[in-house]
Amino acid sequence: MLVWLAEHLVTFYSGFNVFSYLTFRAIVSLLTALFISLWMGPRMIARLQEMSFGQVVRNDGPESHFSKRGTPTMGGIMILTSITVSVLLWAYPSNPYVWCVLFVLVGYGIVGFVDDYRKVVRKDTKGLIARWKYFWQSAIALVVAFVMYMIGKDTPATELVVPFFKDVMPQLGLLYLLLAYFVIVGTSNAVNLTDGLDGLAIMPTVFVAAGFALVAWATGNVKFAEYLHIPYLRHAGELVIVCTAIVGAGLGFLWFNTYPAQVFMGDVGSLALGGALGTIAVLLRQEFLLVIMGGVFVVETLSVILQVGSFKLRGQRIFRMAPIHHHYELKGWPEPRVIVRFWIISLMLVLIGLATLKVR
């Protein structure tokens, strides 16, 4: 919005030309989302407390979590608001990639909101019925996957980028739809599973978004894309604005979500953020990179799959409790230790992922 306005005002004052610079807009996008999140935090927490929108804790969970019962949840609303406002202010409104991410962010946010509402108002720990949650996640993912396919059909935008191999970029064709679907839905649920401790999910999300901001900048730059042997995508640059908005909103939310948390993001936040990261990865053609940089989300999800599979097949559990962060809690690790160590691992994985762009 402000970019469009600046383009019309630059004829009156050349200083408005600064709004055309991607680096400038990336910085102010981050700061805008950060300040909105910090401003909304105390007000939203107070409002959620007034409405008794408190966290519902499962009776079969770790005993240390019983003290979290009643902590305000659905704080993801302020994350989504911060991201959306910042992106609308600083990104080019004509960019289709930006709208694809916002569509998933808001759509999955609505699904998460309904899920949270059932939990906190109806006191139903299961929330939205699983099949309906999956149905709406799938519908949203398929719609945006089809739109993305039509935008980039028969171009590098539908090629598969394989790490370590600079000349291996097969054209996916209609398989693009299937891959996009699984990446978006899978990442959404993976972040949701990770969101079980104070600040555990939001910081890896910030790290991954920051990593993708660098990738988006390189992908949207002809020279750097050629240098790194990745597809040049002319719309990709504006995803930097989306990624930095996620970073800013995430850091602002962490101010209130750090241990001991004053507010939880709820499914309205975790499903939306995961869906947004998955969509960004697909748009940048970096699905494999997401697996590396988002390794914490992958391991959390695999721990649940292995736990359920082992119990059904052998009648035995592999972990004391899944997702795996609960396993370490039950081993006696203090919650802050689990959180910070997962953060460190996440940061390392993002750096490793970025390094793979050059190791080809």
Swiss-Prot record:
Recorded metabolic or biological pathway in which this protein acts: Cell wall biogenesis; peptidoglycan biosynthesis
GO annotation, cellular component aspect: plasma membrane
Stored PROSITE patterns: MRAY_1, MRAY_2
Subcellular location: Cell inner membrane
Cofactor(s) the protein needs: Mg(2+)
GO process terms (BP): cell division; cell wall organization; peptidoglycan biosynthetic process; regulation of cell shape
Disulfide bonds: none
Reaction(s) the record says it catalyses: UDP-N-acetyl-alpha-D-muramoyl-L-alanyl-gamma-D-glutamyl-meso-2,6-diaminopimeloyl-D-alanyl-D-alanine + di-trans,octa-cis-undecaprenyl phosphate = di-trans,octa-cis-undecaprenyl diphospho-N-acetyl-alpha-D-muramoyl-L-alanyl-D-glutamyl-meso-2,6-diaminopimeloyl-D-alanyl-D-alanine + UMP
Pfam entry (one): Glycos_transf_4
Membrane topology: Multi-pass membrane protein
Signal peptide region: none
Entries under InterPro entries matching the protein: Glycosyl_transferase_4 (IPR000715), PNAcMuramoyl-5peptid_Trfase (IPR003524), PNAcMuramoyl-5peptid_Trfase_CS (IPR018480)
GO molecular function: metal ion binding; phospho-N-acetylmuramoyl-pentapeptide-transferase activity; UDP-N-acetylmuramoyl-L-alanyl-D-glutamyl-meso-2,6-diaminopimelyl-D-alanyl-D-alanine:undecaprenyl-phosphate transferase activity
E.C. number(s) listed in UniProt: 2.7.8.13
TM annotation in the entry: 26-46, 72-92, 94-114, 132-152, 168-188, 199-219, 236-256, 263-283, 288-308, 338-358
UniProtKB keywords: Cell cycle, Cell division, Cell inner membrane, Cell membrane, Cell shape, Cell wall biogenesis/degradation, Magnesium, Membrane, Metal-binding, Peptidoglycan synthesis, Transferase, Transmembrane, Transmembrane helix
Family assignment from sequence similarity: Belongs to the glycosyltransferase 4 family. MraY subfamily.
Annotated PANTHER family: PHOSPHO-N-ACETYLMURAMOYL-PENTAPEPTIDE-TRANSFERASE, PHOSPHO-N-ACETYLMURAMOYL-PENTAPEPTIDE-TRANSFERASE HOMOLOG
Function noted in UniProt: Catalyzes the initial step of the lipid cycle reactions in the biosynthesis of the cell wall peptidoglycan: transfers peptidoglycan precursor phospho-MurNAc-pentapeptide from UDP-MurNAc-pentapeptide onto the lipid carrier undecaprenyl phosphate, yielding undecaprenyl-pyrophosphoryl-MurNAc-pentapeptide, known as lipid I.
NCBIfam families tied to this protein: mraY (TIGR00445)
Protein's UniProt name: Phospho-N-acetylmuramoyl-pentapeptide-transferase
Gene: mraY
